């Protein structure tokens, strides 16, 4: 149906002045307007009282079709007019589960905001599928909203198993880091435990990454409470020659990072946590050189920190150049900026903590 046909139907409705909530033509019109992404007609019908929870012969309501279309504006409009986010069709498909499976991140956020049932996400293997398909942003939303990280699928595997099996180190690191920061060390420990119990399924590189991340956390966050699951995991590592060799290599590199001091008198291990972007920026060149020459296992951990430093340093350099250009005119050089040494200019701008402010200079 074209927009012109929909418009004609709208005019007919307006002329007939029907009871919108009881008019079957109006309800059918709402379905068609949603299917054809006609937000103006949808809003007109909703404002005049058409029930957004009416369903068709497939038990599907307008919100099912809006989700299917991926139209965030339409989904939000329906929810604002009391569409039920937890309504299901004759296949027991829910708007929230469909949008998760189809990786419609913004729609999932909207559905959750308007009361979609969070318990539904544990009724299916949604996190398993998100990780299999490398939908990391979706996986993070599921983690934020309480999905079980140790739930096993029909093959008896937890979600992280599929990232490990795929040997995608970037995905594994992202997930481990996010789980630790959002859920804590104990939850991470339980996930690691399940992987270690099945370590023969995985490649050396992924096991190195998993074990190295788990071990370094206890060094970086010294106040962390090491629970029974930590001791159990260490015992598994020590009882396997293969795993204990990986553990030893990790600890040797950690010792190197503890003993290596760069130009600000800061140990590499300390620069990994607790220092601001300016400290990292000042030391990013030395940090990169150290990572390239001294590390093998923990290079993946240092590289993102180096990038933070490089970004901050480039931002400061660009801000200095912008200020230099602005102060070329004598009338603009109020604070005698042009007379200052580069090092002083750099130090002054370091005090601007907000990167957004620096970008505007």
From Swiss-Prot:
Source organism of the structure: Fowlpox virus (strain NVSL)
InterPro entries, per the entry: Ankyrin_rpt, Ankyrin_rpt-contain_sf, PRANC_domain
UniProt-recorded name of the protein: Putative ankyrin repeat protein FPV227
Segment forming the signal sequence: none
Keywords linked to the UniProt accession: ANK repeat, Repeat
A Pfam cross-reference name: Ank_2
Keyword Repeat: yes
ANK repeats: 25-54, 58-87, 91-120, 122-151, 155-184
């Amino acid at each position: 149906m074209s927009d012109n046909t929909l418009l004609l139907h709208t005019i007919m409705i307006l002329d007939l002045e029907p009871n919108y909530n009881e008019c079957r033509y109006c309800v059918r019109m709402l379905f068609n307007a949603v299917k054809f992404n006609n937000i103006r007609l949808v809003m007109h019908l909703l404002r005049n009282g058409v029930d957004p929870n009416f369903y068709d012969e497939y038990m599907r309501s307008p919100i099912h079709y809006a989700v299917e279309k991926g139209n965030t504006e339409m989904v939000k409009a329906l929810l604002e007019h009391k569409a039920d986010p937890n309504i299901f069709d004759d296949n027991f498909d829910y708007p929230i589960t469909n949008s998760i499976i189809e990786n419609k991140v913004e729609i999932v956020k909207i559905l959750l905001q308007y009361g979609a049932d969070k318990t539904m996400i544990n009724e299916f293997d949604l996190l398993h599928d998100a990780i299999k398909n490398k939908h990391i942003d979706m996986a993070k939303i599921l983690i934020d909203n309480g999905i079980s990280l140790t739930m096993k699928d029909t093959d008896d595997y937890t979600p992280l198993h599929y990232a490990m099996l795929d040997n995608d180190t970037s995905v594994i690191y992202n997930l481990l880091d996010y789980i630790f920061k959002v859920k804590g060390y104990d939850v991470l420990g339980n996930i690691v435990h399940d992987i270690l119990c099945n370590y023969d399924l995985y490649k050396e590189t992924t096991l190195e990454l998993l074990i190295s991340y788990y071990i370094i956390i206890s060094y970086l966050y010294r106040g962390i409470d090491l629970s029974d699951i930590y001791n159990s995991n260490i015992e598994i590592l020590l009882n396997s020659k293969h795993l204990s060799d990986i553990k030893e290599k990790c600890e040797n590199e950690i010792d190197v990072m503890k003993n290596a001091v760069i130009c600000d008198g800061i140990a590499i291990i300390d620069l990994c946590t607790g220092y601001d972007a300016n400290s990292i920026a000042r030391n990013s060149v030395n940090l990169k050189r150290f990572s390239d020459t001294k590390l093998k296992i923990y290079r993946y951990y240092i590289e993102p920190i180096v990038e933070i430093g490089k970004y901050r340093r480039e931002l400061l350099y660009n801000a200095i150049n912008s200020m230099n250009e602005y102060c070329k005119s004598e009338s603009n050089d109020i604070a005698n900026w042009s007379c200052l040494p580069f090092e002083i200019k750099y130090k002054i701008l370091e005090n601007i903590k907000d990167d957004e402010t620096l970008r505007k200079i």
